[in-house]
Curated annotation (Swiss-Prot):
This is Beta-ketoacyl-[acyl-carrier-protein] synthase III. It is found in: Cytoplasm. InterPro entries: ACP_syn_III_C (IPR013747), ACP_syn_III_N (IPR013751), FabH (IPR004655), Thiolase-like (IPR016039). Catalyzes the condensation reaction of fatty acid synthesis by the addition to an acyl acceptor of two carbons from malonyl-ACP. Catalyzes the first condensation reaction which initiates fatty acid synthesis and may therefore play a role in governing the total rate of fatty acid production. Possesses both acetoacetyl-ACP synthase and acetyl transacylase activities. Its substrate specificity determines the biosynthesis of branched-chain and/or straight-chain of fatty acids.
């Protein structure tokens, strides 16, 4: 029987950094106002680089670290809500950029849950026995879709990409998962396609940008997401104290504090990096995972149990427990 495992990680963020003090120069806000409410201190902003450029850097780094060729890849999945274009897909652009001629490639759209949804999908592809190796990447350039005059959203988001190499193995590494969607609450967090106009229909300016009902999303995260994490642990062969780290979507530090209390888990087991990157949507979890490996928290030697949980637009939320 075939299984899948995460064998390598990588991440990339644009060089340009915008601090809270920088934002205070262009809108009515302050470092204290932003950081006390979100934990965010700065974010990386793409200037000339596109979503596929960021994802390509991650893909090349994964190949280099793994010492494999692009020709060894069977598939590439990119989770994003900020694609370069509707077609070709961001994943197709990455496939061309790295020369992975044998790989099929497609995008997956599930907002801040995108990486978890994509990783679950990729695990099924490899476990089927039909494929051996694939890249799963979360990549976003959210700076291009936020309204920079709206301090309620503009201060939250940043650009970046992260990803993993998934490979076939004879041992089970994916231990449990739960994925959910509630489209009836979808209007709580929206992002429309900018620049699309028709002589038969007009688009209002306020429909062109990312919008969010912050209170609704906060309540959703601490209620539904926390319960989903509990349910996933119960569906696994593990107890909560057997999980080494909880890598959650980096939306807001207060959300992480609330979830930690609901799970009765020490915050030391819930790493955070939103202070450096802000909310990078589908990229947040793989960036965090890659940084945890760099810092030596996660070993990539098959000895640790890691919980990954994403939540966001759709509304969508999903949790995976994996051996890494």
């Amino acid at each position: 029987m075939k299984f899948a495992k995460i064998s390598q990680v990588a991440h990339y963020a644009p060089e340009q950094v915008v601090t809270n003090d920088d934002l205070a120069q262009i809108m009515d806000t302050s470092d204290e106002w932003i950081s006390s409410r979100t934990g965010i201190k700065k974010r990386h902003i793409s200037h000339h680089e596109s979503t596929s450029d960021l994802a390509t850097r991650v893909a090349l780094d994964l190949l280099k670290k793994s010492e494999i060729s692009a020709q060894d890849l069977d598939f590439i999945i990119v989770a994003t809500i900020t694609p370069d274009s509707l077609m070709p897909s961001t994943a197709a652009r990455v496939q061309a950029n790295i020369g992975a001629k044998k790989a099929f490639a497609y995008d997956l759209v599930a907002a801040c849950s995108g990486f978890v949804f994509a990783l679950s999908t990729a695990e099924k592809l490899i476990s089927s026995g039909a494929y051996q190796k694939g890249l799963v990447i979360g990549s976003e350039t959210l700076s291009k879709v936020v309204d920079w005059s709206d301090r309620g959203t503009a201060v939250l988001f940043g650009d970046g990409a992260g990803g993993v190499l998934l490979e076939s193995t004879s041992d089970q590494h994916f231990l449990a998962e739960i994925q959910k969607t509630d489209g009836s609450r979808g209007e709580s967090l929206t992002s429309c396609l900018m620049g699309l106009q028709s002589p038969f229909a007009q688009t209002e300016d306020d429909e062109k940008y990312l919008t969010m009902d912050g209170r609704a999303i906060f309540d959703f995260a601490i209620r539904d997401v926390a319960q989903s994490i509990k349910d996933t642990i119960e569906a696994s062969p593990l107890e909560v104290d057997e999980i080494d780290y909880f890598l959650l979507h980096q939306a807001n530090d207060r959300i992480l504090n609330k979830i930690a209390k609901k799970l009765s888990v020490s915050r030391d087991k819930i790493p955070a990096n939103m202070m450096e990157y802000g909310n990078t949507s589908a990229a947040s979890i793989p960036i965090l995972l890659s940084e945890c490996v760099e810092q030596g928290l996660v070993k990539l030697d098959g000895s640790q149990k890691i919980l990954l949980s994403g939540f966001g637009g759709g509304l969508t939320w999903g949790t995976l427990i994996v051996t890494i």
